Amino acid sequence: MLDAVLKRTIDPPLDAAAKRLVAFNIKADAITVAAFVLGLAAIAAIAWGYYLPAVVLLALNRLLDGLDGAVTRATGAGPRAVVAATLGTVVLTGIPFGFALADPSRAIAAAFLICALAGASAARISTAVRNGADFVESGVAFVAFAFACLLPDRFSLVAYVLGVLAFVAAGARLAAAVRPT
């Protein structure tokens, strides 16, 4: 639900920015790689306990993640979403790993969340490829991770709640995928 609202709000300015970037011959793949690098930097910042810079890096990662899709739409460059989704999943599952590195007492909660996010990402990718859907599903995860960065002592609670939501989302996608059409 949150992602649908965010998409309606953020797509028009992203599409406008994408047209400008396309005019300068900026490719979606370059934006995807930049988003990935920012995501890796956010993971490192979390691991070192720099939570506020991590929130900024995550926000920039999410912004570029949306922008690479907008550039792809503007250029009609075809389905580049698998590369973006794969790199996005590495960042998404790396964030809980960063929290575990920052404080090993969070390792079990981080492992639970990594498993849940990996399952949800796999289900999302497989059903999106089959149905031609896009890969916008990260608004809730961003809010949860930003909250965890602002209140790192609450990471385990955030991890368990987000993990349950991710498992439910994966189950719902799998149920929809096997339902006769």
Regions found by a protein language model. Name each.
Residues M1-D3, P53-A54:
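A short, structure-level motif marking secondary-structure boundaries and short turns
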